[in-house]
């Protein structure tokens, strides 16, 4: 007997949160629009005791800033945990110093980035790739997707 597949309707943030939850042991989060919902889903699932593919509940650490989240990612990776975080725009810029360290130490991690315009005098919230392109010199591999449900 074959098992029925379960399909759900979701947006890109939920799809990315689902796949990252399944393959992570630690998630260092700090909410920043438009990536906040990814962190919220992961936090909700961990609080409910949902198991990942390793049969464990993901340890979610909400930090005081994006820089703190990047530092927590680096420390967790150093300890050997599969770690992820979620960010956008200025938050990603604050993570760049730790991204250099992570890349230089060849540590495997995933930064889920909801690409957004860097805030200027007009505080624009439209999508572009200024934030992601500012991190391209760190040595981390960048993978871009053209539609929001591709992570799943």
Feature-to-residue mapping (PLM):
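Single conserved hydrophobic/aromatic residue that forms the stacking wall/gate
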Residues: 143-152
């Amino acid at each position: 007997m074959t098992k029925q597949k379960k399909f759900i309707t979701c947006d890109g943030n939920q799809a990315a949160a689902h796949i990252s939850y399944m393959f992570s042991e630690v998630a260092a989060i700090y909410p920043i629009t438009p990536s906040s919902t990814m962190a919220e889903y992961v936090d909700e699932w961990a609080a409910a005791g949902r198991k990942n593919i390793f049969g464990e509940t993901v340890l979610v650490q909400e930090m005081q800033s994006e820089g703190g989240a990047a530092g927590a990612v680096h420390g967790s990776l150093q300890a050997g945990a599969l770690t992820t975080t979620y960010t956008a725009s200025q938050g990603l810029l604050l993570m760049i110093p730790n991204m250099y360290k992570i890349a230089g130490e060849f540590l495997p991690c995933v930064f889920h980035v909801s690409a957004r315009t860097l805030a200027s005098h007009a505080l624009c919230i439209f999508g572009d790739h200024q934030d992601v392109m500012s991190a391209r010199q760190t040595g981390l591999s960048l993978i871009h997707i053209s539609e929001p449900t591709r992570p799943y």
